[in-house]
Amino acid sequence: MKTRQNKDSMSMRSGRKKEAPGPREELRSRGRASPGGVSTSSSDGKAEKSRQTAKKARVEEASTPKVNKQGRSEEISESESEETNAPKKTKTEQELPRPQSPSDLDSLDGRSLNDDGSSDPRDIDQDNRSTSPSIYSPGSVENDSDSSSGLSQGPARPYHPPPLFPPSPQPPDSTPRQPEASFEPHPSVTPTGYHAPMEPPTSRMFQAPPGAPPPHPQLYPGGTGGVLSGPPMGPKGGGAASSVGGPNGGKQHPPPTTPISVSSSGASGAPPTKPPTTPVGGGNLPSAPPPANFPHVTPNLPPPPALRPLNNASASPPGLGAQPLPGHLPSPHAMGQGMGGLPPGPEKGPTLAPSPHSLPPASSSAPAPPMRFPYSSSSSSSAAASSSSSSSSSSASPFPASQALPSYPHSFPPPTSLSVSNQPPKYTQPSLPSQAVWSQGPPPPPPYGRLLANSNAHPGPFPPSTGAQSTAHPPVSTHHHHHQQQQQQQQQQQQQQQQQQQHHGNSGPPPPGAFPHPLEGGSSHHAHPYAMSPSLGSLRPYPPGPAHLPPPHSQVSYSQAGPNGPPVSSSSNSSSSTSQGSYPCSHPSPSQGPQGAPYPFPPVPTVTTSSATLSTVIATVASSPAGYKTASPPGPPPYGKRAPSPGAYKTATPPGYKPGSPPSFRTGTPPGYRGTSPPAGPGTFKPGSPTVGPGPLPPAGPSGLPSLPPPPAAPASGPPLSATQIKQEPAEEYETPESPVPPARSPSPPPKVVDVPSHASQSARFNKHLDRGFNSCARSDLYFVPLEGSKLAKKRADLVEKVRREAEQRAREEKEREREREREKEREREKERELERSVKLAQEGRAPVECPSLGPVPHRPPFEPGSAVATVPPYLGPDTPALRTLSEYARPHVMSPGNRNHPFYVPLGAVDPGLLGYNVPALYSSDPAAREREREARERDLRDRLKPGFEVKPSELEPLHGVPGPGLDPFPRHGGLALQPGPPGLHPFPFHPSLGPLERERLALAAGPALRPDMSYAERLAAERQHAERVAALGNDPLARLQMLNVTPHHHQHSHIHSHLHLHQQDAIHAASASVHPLIDPLASGSHLTRIPYPAGTLPNPLLPHPLHENEVLRHQLFAAPYRDLPASLSAPMSAAHQLQAMHAQSAELQRLALEQQQWLHAHHPLHSVPLPAQEDYYSHLKKESDKPL
């Protein structure tokens, strides 16, 4: 990455037009091959070489990303637009322009760069980016993101999840342009311009951050990824545009500075680091927020200073990684594409820094840093990816992104200052998400706050996030910082060194501690400890007081930035690391060198962690960006946190960053790297912060830090390529883990990405991915490609084939299992359907019965007035007698009514035309009395026909039931019919009122004697009703069947028992009425009821509890209205008797009931038919038993 940065810087220095370099950068960032083009200057050439390699890998990755980027840009734009209509529009506009083409973007950026010299350019940039500043901001951001995305995509592509990506496009747009502008201007601007603008931006940024934080929070609340973006957008809406424009302009201006800074950073590592830091801080934040999403953009523009930071922080937080990246990304794009361009932006940014533009430039610039760091970009990308993943990814992914990133930092510096203030928040946020965390960090940062400080932690978990964000941020910040950082750098450096030492020693540990995220940042943090410390110190306070702390943190961060910058970058890189591990390595070295030894080594380990973390972070960011974003709302605190994060980030980054493992870093470090950059930013920013104000500067610091890492990023970039190329060999990815290399590398010059074939053997060709001068690591610096036809190639092919076959086999087995499961499920469903059908049939009968009751009785309707009708058709009583019987058993009273709505079902059964008619009329509210009489006659007929022997009893029963019995019997059986007719006067209503009680009694009957009296009568009623219903429901078939079953098998017994029972029942009823047969009747009745319930539910309880018992209750009530009254007297005795004889009575009574029912059914077809068939045997059996007991 560093190389890339150098190239960018060089290009910028050369004065190569941002456009030329920008496009190349962009290409590179996009992963295109034209690294040569990029490297106009020797530095550029060198970087280009590295980039080429990286680009190659990236191109593979990024070529797609590029398309993705553009497509995504639109996509993102859309998504962002979704997030914010206005911002989206802006973004879209920008995006569209950006997506138009890298060249276009570069061109725009170039223009911006050219304009870079003045704050106008920034505005122009804005204009370029979008018609309106607001739009421009989004566009810028988005475009940047897009470019960045393209750039990032290569390495960061992994990071740039589509979700994230959407924001990414935005940044890419901006980025492409920015890089251009950044590129040329960068050289032009040089750190000086950069610094100057940077500082104002810083202060501005700081100012903005306070405001921004609210937006930030808003953003955070607004949207996770987009939230941050969104809200910031609102506040930043105009500002965002401005910011974006500013970033663009800023990019143009700052880029020169930053590029130089970056160059320095890239080349020197230390100076560049610092400047990047500042840009990162400022740019990062601003950039990030606007970039993140729509908000990215918007915030990028006008609000950049305040909002952007917020946005960065807030936007970034949500999509911080992504968003900041987007913001950064734009910058990164500018950075990567127009690293030079971006620098100008930053310069401009610095110039504009005072104004919101400053921030935007930072934002723009931010992309540059990501660009600067390919990995950084990646990281940024990651961050962006996380928040604005695609942006981030784009930016980071492509090597160019890396360049852009560097540029970005430069470009971003101006915004960075703004961004910085924001960025600190962002950092804070990033802290959390690392890349997105910077932005996102804030939310988590609160808790993360320290972690934030541990931004690295962020980087760790969110290396990508942090990286992206940090990178993006850092880049932005870096930009700013580059700018500011250069100015600040001296001061910052001093500060940084002091703080570094402080933080290193002080914060270092705290950051790790603070930064649970240390995981990536942990080491990074540790490495960063000193760096982190400053950051942390600041950071920590920052977390406590996001607004205030951020500045301090920023400062601290900044302080560390120099030392930390790389680490942060490392972290970022680490994030990106995966993609561009080598970048971090490279960058870290430079950053490290300048930054300070402290973080370099520790960061390296962290970087490794970062790398892993990066992935984690990326994942986290991707998943957690939202959360982070949400957390982000605490923008201000997050800011503080973020600021700390940068520090931590830096801290963490440096380790990953460490020269030890360029490739590793590339994978692992790049995120860290990015982180580093941001830390540098913070470091630088810190000085700026003090200068501008603690708040903004610290943020800038973090941003700046990222910038720092970006320079290393360039070298790292090479490794990223390697990483990309690593595709061929996973070993390359191991580069990320290479912590040993970082230590070894720390003394060695920063690695340059050369990607030249170094050795060819019979079986493989070795390519030197990194050139570390005298220090070289075969594992991290070389990768080999097996030659076709070699044993190794064959082995690998066989292995691949084997794996593929195994996978296919597994897939097949899985499919088989799945099919099996499906079949089982289907079978289960079938069973369930069957069950439901049977239940429905039973219920339908039951419900319908109730319905009938409802029909006649107003109260009933609640039950299921329409159900009866509906039930009937479904249930063809005679068709499924067995099922019905079962269902009825389940449904106590439904037994008979359960047999299809009796009223309706009866017609189906049509056994008892009269009964059915009667039932139906009852249902239809026929004259109860008439129905009753009709039914009594019918029942008598049925009974006579069914059971001559029993006939008498039924007749008696009818008389007994007389009003309740006969009328009620059939009617209750028929549902409402019985109710109305049975208890025409009393029963209908009494039943209803007593329905609950009756039911309860029925339940109690099963449960206890207390309710049994009613139960017994109710039972009888239910039984009778069921009989009648059954007869009706079953119709001839059921009736005949029941008769056959009942009569034939146990007819005599049944009839005898039934007669006995009936007599008893009648007696009981009479007794109940007259309180005569309390015991016997209750028993008989109770048993009857119980029996009925048994037949119905096979258990009295089921019957009683069943809802249908309402029907039954009605029946019972109908029957029992009088009975109930009687049972009242019988209640006690019956209760006792029933309870005592419950078991006995139940079985005996069940039998009797069954017999009775059967006889009754015979008498009253409805009941008889359904329950009897199945129940018949059971009942006969029970009957025999009951006969003995009874």
Swiss-Prot record:
Disease: Dentatorubral-pallidoluysian atrophy: Autosomal dominant neurodegenerative disorder characterized by a loss of neurons in the dentate nucleus, rubrum, glogus pallidus and Luys'body. Clinical features are myoclonus epilepsy, dementia, and cerebellar ataxia. Onset of the disease occurs usually in the second decade of life and death in the fourth. Congenital hypotonia, epilepsy, developmental delay, and digital anomalies: An autosomal dominant neurodevelopmental syndrome characterized by severe global developmental delay, impaired intellectual development, poor or absent language, significant motor disability with inability to walk, dysmorphic facial features, skeletal anomalies, and variable congenital malformations. Most patients also have seizures and structural brain abnormalities.
Motif Nuclear localization signal mapped to chain: 16-32
PTM info: Phosphorylated in vitro by MAPK8/JNK1 on Ser-739. Mutant ATN1 sequences with expanded poly-Gln (polyQ) traits are more slowly phosphorylated. Proteolytically cleaved, probably in the nucleus, to produce two C-terminal fragments of 140 kDa (F1) and 125 kDa (F2) each containing poly-Gln (polyQ) tracts. F2 is produced by cleavage by caspases and is exported into the cytoplasm. In vitro, cleavage increases with an increase in the number of polyQ tracts. C-terminal proteolytic products appear to be the cause of cell toxicity. In vitro cleavage at Asp-109.
Region listing for Involved in binding BAIAP2, in residue ranges: 517-567
Chain segments carrying region HX repeat: 1049-1065
Residues the UniProt record annotates as site (Cleavage): 109-110
Phosphoserine modified-residue sites: 34, 77, 79, 101, 103, 107, 632, 661, 739, 746, 748, 896
Subcellular location: Nucleus; Cytoplasm, Perinuclear region; Cell junction
UniProt protein name: Atrophin-1
PTM sites of type N6-acetyllysine: 641
Stretch list, region Required for interaction with FAT1: 879-894
